[in-house]
Amino acid sequence: MAESTATTTAVPPPAEESWNADSEDVHQFYWTYTEEPHKSRRAAILKAHPEIASLNGYEPLTKWIVLGVVSLQFTCAYLLSQSSLLSWKFFLTAYFIGAFCNQNLFLAIHELSHNLGFKKTLYNRAYCLFANLPVGAPFAASFRPYHMEHHAYQGVDGMDTDLPTRAELILFDNVLGKAFFCTFQLLFYAFRPLVVRRLPFTLMHFWNIIVQFSFDYLVVRYVGWRALAYFFMSSFLAGSLHPTAGHFLSEHYNMTRTRLIASGPGKETPLETFSYYGPLNFFVYNAGYHIEHHDFPYVAWTRIGKVRELAPEFYDNIPDCKSWCGIIYQFITDSNVGMWCRVKRKQKHADIPTKSMHLHVS
Protein backbone atom coordinates (compact mmCIF):
# COMPACT_ATOMS: atom_id res chain seq x y z
CA MET A 1 0.00 0.00 0.00
CA ALA A 2 1.35 3.44 -0.89
CA GLU A 3 2.05 5.97 1.82
CA SER A 4 3.37 9.49 1.32
CA THR A 5 5.09 11.91 3.61
CA ALA A 6 5.89 15.46 2.58
CA THR A 7 5.89 19.04 3.75
CA THR A 8 2.83 20.69 2.25
CA THR A 9 1.64 24.15 1.43
CA ALA A 10 -1.50 25.37 -0.28
CA VAL A 11 -0.92 26.25 -3.91
CA PRO A 12 -3.38 28.47 -5.82
CA PRO A 13 -4.87 27.29 -9.10
CA PRO A 14 -2.98 28.10 -12.31
CA ALA A 15 -3.51 31.58 -13.68
CA GLU A 16 -5.05 30.26 -16.89
CA GLU A 17 -8.82 30.38 -17.30
CA SER A 18 -10.87 27.22 -17.28
CA TRP A 19 -11.44 25.86 -20.73
CA ASN A 20 -14.57 27.24 -22.38
CA ALA A 21 -16.49 25.01 -24.76
CA ASP A 22 -17.74 28.10 -26.60
CA SER A 23 -14.25 29.45 -27.23
CA GLU A 24 -13.21 29.74 -30.86
CA ASP A 25 -9.72 28.64 -29.90
CA VAL A 26 -9.87 25.01 -28.83
CA HIS A 27 -6.08 24.70 -28.84
CA GLN A 28 -5.81 24.84 -25.07
CA PHE A 29 -5.71 22.34 -22.25
CA TYR A 30 -8.85 21.06 -20.61
CA TRP A 31 -8.91 22.29 -17.01
CA THR A 32 -10.93 20.50 -14.36
CA TYR A 33 -11.41 20.67 -10.60
CA THR A 34 -12.24 16.97 -10.26
CA GLU A 35 -9.80 14.61 -8.57
CA GLU A 36 -7.78 12.18 -10.62
CA PRO A 37 -10.19 9.42 -11.68
CA HIS A 38 -8.35 6.25 -10.73
CA LYS A 39 -8.71 6.43 -6.95
CA SER A 40 -12.51 6.34 -7.16
CA ARG A 41 -12.40 3.77 -9.97
CA ARG A 42 -10.18 1.51 -7.87
CA ALA A 43 -12.60 1.67 -4.95
CA ALA A 44 -15.59 0.90 -7.16
CA ILE A 45 -13.85 -1.98 -8.93
CA LEU A 46 -12.68 -3.57 -5.68
CA LYS A 47 -16.15 -3.25 -4.22
CA ALA A 48 -17.58 -5.14 -7.19
CA HIS A 49 -14.64 -7.52 -7.62
CA PRO A 50 -12.65 -7.87 -4.37
CA GLU A 51 -10.75 -10.83 -5.84
CA ILE A 52 -8.72 -8.39 -7.96
CA ALA A 53 -6.74 -7.45 -4.84
CA SER A 54 -5.13 -10.90 -4.97
CA LEU A 55 -3.45 -9.94 -8.27
CA ASN A 56 -1.10 -7.50 -6.52
CA GLY A 57 2.52 -8.56 -6.28
CA TYR A 58 5.82 -8.89 -8.10
CA GLU A 59 6.71 -11.04 -11.10
CA PRO A 60 9.97 -13.10 -10.85
CA LEU A 61 10.10 -13.57 -14.64
CA THR A 62 10.89 -9.89 -15.15
CA LYS A 63 14.51 -10.13 -14.01
CA TRP A 64 15.28 -12.92 -16.47
CA ILE A 65 13.80 -11.03 -19.39
CA VAL A 66 15.84 -7.96 -18.45
CA LEU A 67 18.97 -10.10 -18.26
CA GLY A 68 18.28 -11.46 -21.73
CA VAL A 69 17.57 -8.04 -23.25
CA VAL A 70 20.68 -6.46 -21.71
CA SER A 71 22.76 -9.39 -23.01
CA LEU A 72 21.27 -9.02 -26.50
CA GLN A 73 22.01 -5.31 -26.56
CA PHE A 74 25.60 -5.82 -25.46
CA THR A 75 26.03 -8.51 -28.14
CA CYS A 76 24.70 -6.17 -30.84
CA ALA A 77 26.92 -3.35 -29.61
CA TYR A 78 29.96 -5.63 -29.74
CA LEU A 79 29.15 -6.84 -33.26
CA LEU A 80 28.68 -3.26 -34.49
CA SER A 81 31.78 -1.89 -32.78
CA GLN A 82 33.68 -1.76 -36.09
CA SER A 83 30.76 -0.59 -38.24
CA SER A 84 30.20 2.94 -39.48
CA LEU A 85 27.46 4.89 -37.74
CA LEU A 86 26.26 5.93 -41.19
CA SER A 87 25.90 2.39 -42.49
CA TRP A 88 22.52 0.81 -43.08
CA LYS A 89 23.56 -2.14 -40.95
CA PHE A 90 24.15 0.11 -37.96
CA PHE A 91 20.92 2.08 -38.36
CA LEU A 92 18.65 -0.87 -39.13
CA THR A 93 20.02 -2.88 -36.21
CA ALA A 94 19.52 0.08 -33.89
CA TYR A 95 15.96 0.61 -35.17
CA PHE A 96 14.65 -2.94 -35.45
CA ILE A 97 16.54 -4.52 -32.55
CA GLY A 98 18.04 -1.81 -30.36
CA ALA A 99 14.99 0.43 -30.12
CA PHE A 100 12.71 -2.48 -29.27
CA CYS A 101 15.21 -3.65 -26.66
CA ASN A 102 15.67 -0.26 -25.04
CA GLN A 103 11.94 0.43 -25.03
CA ASN A 104 11.64 -2.91 -23.25
CA LEU A 105 14.20 -1.72 -20.71
CA PHE A 106 12.42 1.63 -20.26
CA LEU A 107 9.28 -0.26 -19.31
CA ALA A 108 11.23 -2.79 -17.23
CA ILE A 109 12.47 0.13 -15.15
CA HIS A 110 8.86 1.23 -14.92
CA GLU A 111 7.90 -2.18 -13.51
CA LEU A 112 10.84 -2.15 -11.11
CA SER A 113 9.93 1.36 -9.98
CA HIS A 114 6.63 -0.09 -8.77
CA ASN A 115 8.56 -2.83 -6.92
CA LEU A 116 7.19 -5.45 -9.30
CA GLY A 117 10.42 -7.28 -10.13
CA PHE A 118 11.49 -8.46 -6.68
CA LYS A 119 9.93 -8.81 -3.26
CA LYS A 120 12.44 -6.47 -1.60
CA THR A 121 12.57 -2.78 -2.51
CA LEU A 122 16.38 -2.68 -2.45
CA TYR A 123 16.62 -5.40 -5.08
CA ASN A 124 14.23 -3.53 -7.36
CA ARG A 125 16.31 -0.35 -7.02
CA ALA A 126 19.58 -2.16 -7.70
CA TYR A 127 18.21 -4.00 -10.72
CA CYS A 128 17.01 -0.68 -12.15
CA LEU A 129 20.67 0.32 -12.39
CA PHE A 130 21.42 -2.88 -14.30
CA ALA A 131 18.48 -2.43 -16.68
CA ASN A 132 19.64 1.15 -17.26
CA LEU A 133 23.05 0.11 -18.64
CA PRO A 134 22.22 -0.23 -22.39
CA VAL A 135 20.27 3.04 -22.29
CA GLY A 136 23.57 4.92 -22.17
CA ALA A 137 22.50 7.76 -19.86
CA PRO A 138 21.45 7.45 -16.20
CA PHE A 139 17.71 7.95 -15.81
CA ALA A 140 16.32 5.17 -13.59
CA ALA A 141 16.84 7.03 -10.31
CA SER A 142 15.05 10.13 -11.59
CA PHE A 143 12.24 8.23 -13.26
CA ARG A 144 10.83 6.61 -10.14
CA PRO A 145 10.01 9.67 -7.99
CA TYR A 146 8.58 11.57 -10.95
CA HIS A 147 6.52 8.57 -11.98
CA MET A 148 5.15 8.06 -8.48
CA GLU A 149 4.01 11.67 -8.49
CA HIS A 150 2.43 11.12 -11.90
CA HIS A 151 0.25 8.43 -10.32
CA ALA A 152 -0.57 10.37 -7.16
CA TYR A 153 -1.15 13.73 -8.87
CA GLN A 154 -2.24 12.80 -12.38
CA GLY A 155 -2.99 15.94 -14.34
CA VAL A 156 -2.02 18.37 -11.57
CA ASP A 157 -0.22 21.27 -13.18
CA GLY A 158 3.26 21.73 -11.73
CA MET A 159 3.27 18.25 -10.19
CA ASP A 160 2.66 15.80 -13.02
CA THR A 161 5.69 16.23 -15.29
CA ASP A 162 4.12 13.95 -17.90
CA LEU A 163 2.00 16.96 -18.89
CA PRO A 164 3.18 19.24 -21.72
CA THR A 165 3.90 22.81 -20.71
CA ARG A 166 2.25 25.94 -22.10
CA ALA A 167 5.46 26.67 -24.03
CA GLU A 168 5.31 23.27 -25.74
CA LEU A 169 1.67 23.86 -26.65
CA ILE A 170 2.55 27.15 -28.35
CA LEU A 171 5.75 25.99 -30.06
CA PHE A 172 4.42 22.72 -31.45
CA ASP A 173 0.99 23.83 -32.63
CA ASN A 174 1.34 22.69 -36.25
CA VAL A 175 2.39 19.68 -38.31
CA LEU A 176 6.10 20.52 -38.31
CA GLY A 177 6.09 21.29 -34.60
CA LYS A 178 4.30 18.09 -33.70
CA ALA A 179 6.61 16.09 -35.97
CA PHE A 180 9.58 17.66 -34.18
CA PHE A 181 8.06 16.79 -30.80
CA CYS A 182 7.46 13.16 -31.78
CA THR A 183 10.96 12.83 -33.25
CA PHE A 184 12.68 14.14 -30.12
CA GLN A 185 10.01 13.11 -27.62
CA LEU A 186 12.41 11.33 -25.30
CA LEU A 187 14.39 14.53 -24.77
CA PHE A 188 11.26 16.37 -23.66
CA TYR A 189 10.51 13.69 -21.09
CA ALA A 190 14.12 13.92 -19.90
CA PHE A 191 14.39 17.70 -19.57
CA ARG A 192 10.81 18.83 -18.87
CA PRO A 193 11.01 17.80 -15.18
CA LEU A 194 14.03 20.07 -14.73
CA VAL A 195 11.90 23.02 -15.78
CA VAL A 196 8.57 22.07 -14.19
CA ARG A 197 9.59 20.49 -10.88
CA ARG A 198 13.07 19.66 -9.67
CA LEU A 199 13.34 16.95 -7.05
CA PRO A 200 16.17 16.50 -4.54
CA PHE A 201 19.36 14.70 -5.53
CA THR A 202 19.50 11.43 -3.60
CA LEU A 203 21.96 8.62 -2.95
CA MET A 204 20.13 6.60 -5.61
CA HIS A 205 20.88 9.31 -8.17
CA PHE A 206 24.54 9.21 -7.13
CA TRP A 207 24.82 5.46 -7.63
CA ASN A 208 22.92 5.62 -10.90
CA ILE A 209 25.44 8.13 -12.25
CA ILE A 210 28.50 6.26 -10.93
CA VAL A 211 27.38 2.86 -12.22
CA GLN A 212 26.22 4.17 -15.61
CA PHE A 213 29.25 6.30 -16.42
CA SER A 214 31.61 3.57 -15.22
CA PHE A 215 29.89 1.16 -17.57
CA ASP A 216 30.04 3.67 -20.43
CA TYR A 217 33.77 4.18 -19.83
CA LEU A 218 34.45 0.45 -19.85
CA VAL A 219 32.46 0.02 -23.07
CA VAL A 220 34.45 2.74 -24.83
CA ARG A 221 37.75 1.52 -23.37
CA TYR A 222 37.38 -2.16 -24.26
CA VAL A 223 34.78 -2.34 -27.04
CA GLY A 224 34.91 1.05 -28.71
CA TRP A 225 32.98 4.28 -28.91
CA ARG A 226 30.72 2.95 -31.67
CA ALA A 227 29.32 0.40 -29.22
CA LEU A 228 28.32 3.21 -26.87
CA ALA A 229 26.92 5.15 -29.83
CA TYR A 230 24.75 2.13 -30.60
CA PHE A 231 23.27 2.27 -27.10
CA PHE A 232 22.47 5.97 -27.43
CA MET A 233 21.02 5.57 -30.92
CA SER A 234 18.84 2.71 -29.70
CA SER A 235 17.49 4.90 -26.90
CA PHE A 236 16.90 7.86 -29.20
CA LEU A 237 15.03 5.77 -31.77
CA ALA A 238 12.97 4.07 -29.05
CA GLY A 239 11.59 7.47 -28.08
CA SER A 240 11.28 8.81 -31.61
CA LEU A 241 9.29 7.79 -34.70
CA HIS A 242 9.14 4.15 -33.66
CA PRO A 243 6.10 1.88 -33.26
CA THR A 244 6.64 1.33 -29.53
CA ALA A 245 6.97 5.09 -28.92
CA GLY A 246 3.26 5.35 -29.60
CA HIS A 247 2.62 4.45 -25.98
CA PHE A 248 3.81 7.91 -24.91
CA LEU A 249 0.86 9.40 -26.82
CA SER A 250 -1.76 6.69 -26.34
CA GLU A 251 -1.63 6.71 -22.55
CA HIS A 252 -3.08 10.14 -21.74
CA TYR A 253 -3.70 12.16 -24.91
CA ASN A 254 -7.40 12.42 -25.73
CA MET A 255 -7.16 12.08 -29.50
CA THR A 256 -10.87 12.73 -30.16
CA ARG A 257 -11.14 16.45 -29.62
CA THR A 258 -14.92 16.35 -30.10
CA ARG A 259 -15.12 14.28 -26.92
CA LEU A 260 -13.56 17.21 -25.07
CA ILE A 261 -15.94 19.75 -26.58
CA ALA A 262 -18.97 17.59 -25.86
CA SER A 263 -18.08 17.46 -22.18
CA GLY A 264 -17.09 21.00 -21.34
CA PRO A 265 -17.19 22.79 -17.97
CA GLY A 266 -20.13 21.72 -15.86
CA LYS A 267 -20.48 18.47 -17.73
CA GLU A 268 -18.81 15.10 -17.49
CA THR A 269 -15.01 15.28 -17.28
CA PRO A 270 -13.41 13.92 -20.46
CA LEU A 271 -11.47 10.71 -20.53
CA GLU A 272 -7.78 11.13 -19.72
CA THR A 273 -6.30 7.63 -19.60
CA PHE A 274 -6.45 5.10 -22.41
CA SER A 275 -5.31 1.55 -23.10
CA TYR A 276 -3.85 -0.26 -26.09
CA TYR A 277 -4.46 -4.00 -26.38
CA GLY A 278 -2.46 -4.76 -29.53
CA PRO A 279 0.49 -7.08 -30.25
CA LEU A 280 3.22 -4.57 -29.36
CA ASN A 281 2.43 -5.18 -25.70
CA PHE A 282 4.58 -8.29 -26.11
CA PHE A 283 7.70 -6.11 -26.21
CA VAL A 284 6.87 -3.74 -23.34
CA TYR A 285 5.50 -5.71 -20.39
CA ASN A 286 1.88 -5.04 -21.37
CA ALA A 287 2.39 -1.31 -20.88
CA GLY A 288 -0.55 -0.73 -23.20
CA TYR A 289 -2.91 -1.77 -20.40
CA HIS A 290 -2.63 1.73 -19.05
CA ILE A 291 -6.06 2.34 -17.56
CA GLU A 292 -5.72 -0.97 -15.77
CA HIS A 293 -2.24 0.02 -14.57
CA HIS A 294 -3.41 3.35 -13.14
CA ASP A 295 -6.34 1.63 -11.48
CA PHE A 296 -4.05 -1.04 -9.97
CA PRO A 297 -0.40 0.11 -10.11
CA TYR A 298 0.88 -2.78 -8.02
CA VAL A 299 -0.30 -5.56 -10.32
CA ALA A 300 2.62 -6.92 -12.36
CA TRP A 301 2.57 -7.09 -16.15
CA THR A 302 1.82 -10.83 -16.33
CA ARG A 303 -1.45 -10.31 -14.43
CA ILE A 304 -2.58 -6.84 -15.50
CA GLY A 305 -4.72 -8.27 -18.31
CA LYS A 306 -6.61 -10.28 -15.72
CA VAL A 307 -7.96 -7.04 -14.24
CA ARG A 308 -9.92 -6.34 -17.40
CA GLU A 309 -11.07 -9.96 -17.61
CA LEU A 310 -12.45 -9.90 -14.07
CA ALA A 311 -14.10 -6.47 -14.36
CA PRO A 312 -15.07 -6.04 -18.04
CA GLU A 313 -17.93 -3.67 -17.24
CA PHE A 314 -15.38 -1.08 -16.06
CA TYR A 315 -13.24 -1.25 -19.22
CA ASP A 316 -15.15 -2.47 -22.26
CA ASN A 317 -17.03 0.82 -22.71
CA ILE A 318 -13.86 2.94 -22.72
CA PRO A 319 -12.38 3.72 -26.17
CA ASP A 320 -8.95 2.18 -26.68
CA CYS A 321 -6.04 2.96 -28.98
CA LYS A 322 -6.03 0.57 -31.94
CA SER A 323 -2.52 1.28 -33.24
CA TRP A 324 0.58 2.92 -31.79
CA CYS A 325 1.84 3.68 -35.30
CA GLY A 326 -1.56 5.11 -36.16
CA ILE A 327 -1.70 7.40 -33.15
CA ILE A 328 1.71 8.90 -33.98
CA TYR A 329 0.52 9.59 -37.54
CA GLN A 330 -2.77 11.06 -36.33
CA PHE A 331 -1.07 13.22 -33.72
CA ILE A 332 1.24 14.76 -36.32
CA THR A 333 -1.18 15.19 -39.23
CA ASP A 334 -4.58 15.84 -37.61
CA SER A 335 -5.11 19.56 -36.99
CA ASN A 336 -7.85 18.76 -34.47
CA VAL A 337 -5.47 17.14 -32.00
CA GLY A 338 -2.16 18.13 -30.50
CA MET A 339 -0.31 19.02 -27.33
CA TRP A 340 -3.47 20.57 -25.91
CA CYS A 341 -5.39 17.28 -25.77
CA ARG A 342 -4.54 16.69 -22.12
CA VAL A 343 -6.56 17.15 -18.95
CA LYS A 344 -5.03 19.42 -16.30
CA ARG A 345 -6.37 19.83 -12.78
CA LYS A 346 -6.93 22.88 -10.64
CA GLN A 347 -7.00 21.63 -7.06
CA LYS A 348 -8.25 24.66 -5.16
CA HIS A 349 -8.53 22.89 -1.82
CA ALA A 350 -5.64 20.46 -2.18
CA ASP A 351 -2.35 20.63 -0.39
CA ILE A 352 0.51 20.03 -2.76
CA PRO A 353 3.91 18.85 -1.47
CA THR A 354 6.68 21.40 -1.88
CA LYS A 355 9.29 18.69 -1.66
CA SER A 356 9.65 15.26 -3.14
CA MET A 357 7.07 12.66 -2.24
CA HIS A 358 8.46 9.60 -0.53
CA LEU A 359 6.42 6.57 -1.50
CA HIS A 360 6.83 3.24 0.20
CA VAL A 361 5.24 0.00 -0.84
CA SER A 362 4.48 -2.62 1.76
Curated annotation (Swiss-Prot):
UniProt feature, compositional bias: Low complexity: 1-10
Swiss-Prot/TrEMBL keywords: Lipid metabolism, Membrane, Oxidoreductase, Sphingolipid metabolism, Transmembrane, Transmembrane helix
Entry-linked CDD domains: Delta4-sphingolipid-FADS-like (cd03508)
Pfam families, alphabetized: FA_desaturase, Lipid_DES
Matches recorded under InterPro entries: DES1/DES2, FA_desaturase_dom, Sphingolipid_d4-desaturase_N
Molecular-function GO terms, alphabetical: sphingolipid delta-4 desaturase activity
Membrane topology of this protein: Multi-pass membrane protein
PANTHER family (alphabetical): SPHINGOLIPID DELTA 4 DESATURASE/C-4 HYDROXYLASE PROTEIN DES2, SPHINGOLIPID DELTA(4)-DESATURASE DES1
Recorded family membership: Belongs to the fatty acid desaturase type 1 family. DEGS subfamily.
Name of the protein this chain belongs to: Sphingolipid delta(4)-desaturase
Organism listed in the record: Schizosaccharomyces pombe (strain 972 / ATCC 24843)
Name of the gene: dsd1
